Amino acid sequence: MTLTEQFFSQLPEDNLAALRRTDALWRSLRLGILPVPTVVRESAEPLEKIDWDVVICGGTLGILLGAALAQRGWRVVVLERGSLRGRDQEWNISRRELDVFVSLGLLTSAELEQAIATEYNPARIRFFGGDEVWVKDVLNIGVDPVYLLETLKQKFLQAGGQLFEQTPFAGAIVHSNGAIVQAGEQRFSTRLVLDAMGHFSPIVQQARQGKTPDAVCLVVGSCATGFPPNETGDLLVSFTPIQNQCQYFWEAFPARDGRTTYLFTYVDTHRDRPSLEALFEDYLRLMPDYQGVEFNQIQPKRALFGFFPCYRNSPLKPNWDRILPIGDSSGSQSPLSFGGFGAMVRHLQRLTIGIDQALQADVCDRRALSQLQPYQPNLSVTWLFQRTMSVRMDQKIAPNQINNTLSSVFQGMATLGDPVLKPFLQDVVQFPALFKTLTKTALTRPQVVVSVIPQVGIPALASWMRHYVTLATYAALYPLSQPLIAPWLTTLSPTARYYSQRWLDAFKYGSGGDYGE
């Protein structure tokens, strides 16, 4: 019996089956045999009657936006294929990012505090052979998904929203003035469809037409007891060189019922990449070295596993009128992050206001909706970082090159202070911080820059330069655009106001200007 089988034998039987189902999906992706569904069709006929303003497909994170829109008076339906209930595993985020729930009126301050299950400080960053860097107040809050989603669900229902559970999305027909959503045995007519079904949404699969992801983040982990007492966390740690053409990274933090640990790695979709079960075996094999605990002392509460595909063509632009991808469906997170809750929260206020204005102006065509998922150069520049943290199957680099590069970069950021380090750790890249980091690394560790160029390749570097220059442009335009455009917004027509506000949002979020607000 493998370590993985021994570990999963202590959990309900369906856990190992779920791991192997996810592995089968990962294998199909590597082999390029995932079927491309056809779930969206178009009709030139207008709808005679429209019952809803918004239908949200996918309730786990869709309920966040659903509650915000329902409280603004819109007729909103949320469709969930199962039961709308949060998972038992906490969502980790920084406290500042949670303020949006209070500012949007979704939670009171007391409710927000009750939603916080755990809090720890500080967190460690360290790479094999390098020095430790410690930070405070970054991804150190564990939110209770069960309480949060139940509270938001009740707020949603109290505001007049309707929730349909056990109602899986089956298809949509886009008409000139709305859309029909088929879910379960029911049909819903609506002005706008929001796709919150995640990375493997059938709508997204149809839109991408089987395109292979440009990168994938593989993640395995668990919440367990039996570890030595430790009230600190790890944000990004490695303690091994490259193995199996993968650089393994680790994350750990205290949880309500134990300690959560993850192993993750950045890869491409080469058919010889490891399975999640093989990665889980390495996770358990290396755990004694990582946490100072013998395998037989670990008492698992939950197993965690998954993979997150990333596309350079992100955020995903709408392919049809009346349908907008949001959250993981849109790919609106950097290729370095797991996306999910944190990415949804970051864009919650922007999407709430933007969708509200789109409905007011009745601009739900493809061109208008694409303004809600704009190009973000601060996300695009992170693709180069993703390449420096991964190695191709046919590539030969020094075993510790990735560790040495990252150690040099993060040591440099640490000396530049929290204003440089913290935003990057929270998936927000800003031009001044990036410029300072790259300049310091080039001046103090030129050998690191020289070693990275052949690793990432000239084409990737050239593409990155374009995004880097655009990021600098956005950083300059954002503070200029606010005083020039914002005072005139109230004098514009609803349509002109919608497009103007989207430009302001693009500069703000694309430059990382939303950080700290």
Regions from the PLM with identified roles:
Residues 55, 59, 65-90:
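Glycine-rich FAD pyrophosphate-binding loop
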Residues 83-124:
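N-terminal FAD cofactor-binding segment of flavoenzymes
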Residues 44-59:
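Beta1/beta-strand and adjacent pyrophosphate-binding region of the FAD-binding site
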Residues 95-104, 122, 130-148:
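Dinucleotide-binding Rossmann-like beta1-alpha1 core, especially the glycine-rich loop
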